[in-house]
């Protein structure tokens, strides 16, 4: 699905931003346009790619000219407004540019994941370290009551879906590229089975749709339980959690076999 012209028009302005005040205006307008795109049910992954590129172009533009290296979701092409923008390096004023329009942003904690997402060299033993870090993020199983997911169980889309899947994808294909692309490359590298990659891709897209919808509704930063989700979202979230749990079990088992 092609992006709406309003998105394309704004993305053309970003690299030519001439001041940090203009940057704030572009970031604010981007959120308005993104809300319209969500309302029209545009593709969530394409919207994340667009938003990531916009953030990157603004940070590198003449008016901002920040010396930092973006990492995390923005560097991968996975950025959403509800996910903090993170970077490596120092720029005391950059956080304020984002905060002024209601966006979270800060310097990243130095880690192998941050370095990989920023496009820095992995180093010896790096892939094993990424695998161990990813498997350490395996989400807990959904609590069940009478054979059904406990409706009082906490919902944390980032912690139970997005972060674990991004971590596995980072191990499968280190380098600053979108998570869905990393998963596909992981199959080519024979680190992921086709079934595991497809399952994680589905869970990732589900998580992105849910996260973007909660941002659109203005509740993405509020604590929530399964009971708070609409029935279809509740079912989708539960299914995605089970998919991720099964995929992590499969990947962990394969990793043990290759030791």
Residues covered by each model-derived region:
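Conserved catalytic core of two-metal-ion nucleotidyltransferases
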Residues: 59, 63, 69, 76, ...
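Generic structural signal of hydrophobic/aromatic residues within well-ordered alpha-helices
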Residues: 6-17, 23, 27-30, 34, ...
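Conserved nucleotidyltransferase catalytic core and NTase-mimicking acidic/glycine-rich helix/loop elements
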Residues: 34, 126-259
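N-terminal regions immediately upstream of nucleotidyltransferase
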Residues: 1-66
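Active-site nucleotide-donor binding segment shared across nucleotidyl transfer reactions
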Residues: 42, 52-91
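Glycine- and acidic
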Residues: 36-45, 83-88, 149-153
């Amino acid at each position: 699905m092609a992006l709406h012209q309003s998105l394309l028009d704004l993305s053309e302005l970003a690299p030519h931003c001439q001041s940090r005040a203009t940057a704030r205006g572009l970031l604010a307008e981007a959120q308005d346009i993104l809300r319209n795109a969500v309302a029209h049910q545009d593709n969530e992954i394409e919207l994340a790619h667009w938003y990531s590129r916009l953030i990157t172009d603004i940070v590198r533009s003449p008016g901002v000219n920040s010396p930092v290296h973006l990492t995390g979701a923005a560097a991968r092409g996975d950025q959403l407004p509800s996910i903090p923008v993170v970077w490596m390096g120092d720029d005391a004023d950059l956080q304020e540019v984002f905060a002024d329009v209601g966006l979270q942003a800060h310097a990243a904690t130095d880690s192998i994941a941050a370095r990989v997402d920023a496009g820095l060299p992995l180093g010896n033993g790096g892939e094993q370290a990424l695998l161990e870090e990813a498997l350490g993020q395996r989400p807990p199983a959904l609590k069940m009551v009478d054979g059904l997911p406990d409706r009082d169980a906490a919902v944390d889309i980032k912690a139970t879906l997005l972060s674990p899947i991004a971590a596995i994808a980072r191990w499968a294909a280190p380098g600053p590229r979108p998570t869905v692309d990393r998963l596909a490359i992981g199959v080519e590298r024979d680190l992921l089975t086709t079934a595991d990659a497809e399952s994680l891709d589905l869970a990732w897209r589900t998580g992105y749709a849910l996260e973007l919808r909660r941002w659109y509704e203005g509740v993405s930063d509020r604590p929530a339980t399964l009971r708070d989700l609409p029935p279809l979202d509740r079912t989708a979230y539960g299914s995605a959690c089970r998919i991720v749990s099964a995929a992590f079990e499969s990947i962990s088992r394969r990793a043990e076999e290759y030791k």
